[in-house]
Amino acid sequence: MKVAVLQFPGTNCEFDAKYAFTKLGCDVEVIWHKDTKLPENTDLVVVPGGFSYGDYLRSGAIARFANIMEDVKKFATNGGKVLGICNGFQILLEVVLLLGAMKRNDTLHFISKYHTLKVIDNNNDFLRLLNIGDVVNIPVAHHDGNYYIDEVGLKELEANNQ
């Protein structure tokens, strides 16, 4: 599997992602935000966490204008798989590859803790080795982690098993 991991000024997890996918046997290339094309035969694009461009305006707001994002949008629109981790998820929201938006945490404080999730669907490449009903603990760390989507958007996600 060929994995392209994006790198923006301020991201800090691109080499963690490269390490993890390399350990899984993937061919991984880190792609600088000013590049305009993903590597040929890319199977997966990973948009990593951190604080792209310092998150000065809004998390991911500036990164959405990076040169590479046009090719990422084209890749995703043509059925390519894209994984957004932390700030990467926020970037995907800003570039409108995902529905919804991120808001500040209700507490208005930075949150860093483990969160328990229950697997309700494993019909995808990321969860296929887990069983429905499995419980996993994942670390979360964010200031803008309050995902919001309107009712129409939520119904669309549910209809697409997303």
Regions found by a protein language model. Name each.
Residues 96, 120-123, 143:
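Short loop segments at secondary-structure junctions
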